Amino acid sequence: MKSNSIITFVLLVCFSLTSVAQSTVDDPEIKKMLAEVKSENMEATVRKLVSFGTRHTLSDTKSNTRGIGAAQRWVKSEFDKYALASGGRLTSVIDYFTVKADGRRIATDSQLGNVMATLKGTDPTDDRVMVISGHLDSRASDVMDAKSDAPGANDDASGVACMMELARIMSQREFPFTLIFVAVVGEEQGLYGAKHLADKAKNEKWNLIAMFNNDMIGNSLSSGTMLRDNTRVRVFSEAIPFLETEAEAKVRKSINRDNDSPSRQLARYIKTVTNQYVDQLDIALVYRNDRFLRGGDHTPFSQNGFTAVRFCEMNENYDHQHQDVRKENNIQYGDLVEFMDFEYMKKVTLSNLASYSNLALSPKAPINVGIEVKDLTNFSTLVWTAPAGKPVYGYNILVRETSSQHWEKTIFVKGTKAEIPYSKDNFFFAVQAVDELGHSSLPVFPLPIR
């Protein structure tokens, strides 16, 4: 009887795999949103931000034509336009806060302000929150130079334009939980705007399930090596969580979970959704929190225990990054609009929109996800508890070999327990909840159950 049941289950698994492949269809509403992304809109946003001369965090706040203050007010005015089409659900604010002089990149006590739009969810019982950001500030060669031109077309008007395009499109629709779109400041001076928002989320106990940081997504040509790559974008994610208790570390080490942090699961999620919805763009999963010895606005969120990733172009051009605008030895330096690849930037924005909206429409993730370890067997039994809230149609069990970066197999099941013919010695697993339209939650890595 046991052998017959195993054979039957294997056949069911094979059938499930076939069924999933046949039934994976694009959500027409997400496809409609993607069709509304316009590279000319984002180019206009980038050019407008560049027109403010400099957006240095400590630059002029009074002028209406130059400096960070003018840029902040313009972004808010755009958010206010989007609000008109939102049925009153989108609201915007410049969230001012004070940063004390730090002896490094903040010379005197300064008032900074993140420009934030909040799209209120339609389900009052769903307390989830997501954040997407780009940083509004720019810099010249000298990080303390608040006077010289610092156009910041790519770093990071590109990320702000991406975020604003999502705000424009998504504010016309309804989503069950709250979505936040924010142009943070103080990035170049020490991630101050992101830290302020991350601390706010922690102190106010937000149920923040994901944070998308877009920083430099509009350049496709590297300096020096002269490599042009407009078909890949890097997504950075932390390996071992910044916040990890001694007990959690002990479990992680015992099951070799070093590459399965929640942030890394988000990165894989983005890759899966991008493969489904976006042509000619591959997500390059980079197994580090950020570039070598560098940081970004997702980092304060990770440090506060939130799931966060960074989108960044595949190859950076250091002639156009943190440079005074000048020409030397026939080389044009400076972060100018003329060096932008807006079609590449559009594809990265499509990836953001597909992933952000798919997750925004998803059911909550399964809870108490575990893998039974009471018996030695070449089968693996996973169990979990159904989440509260939005109805769940079923669950995806994700499977990959231990040496693989990305999930390789998807097994769809309807219950909350499944025995699958894959050894826990040779494979990693995760479970995600799925609704009837295929919107899936973030994957949850199982913990051992004895």
Segments (PLM) and residue ranges:
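Conserved aromatic anchor
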Residues: N378-P391
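Beta-strand-rich modules
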Residues: I420-S441
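Metal-dependent peptidase/peptidase-like ectodomains
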Residues: V184-G296
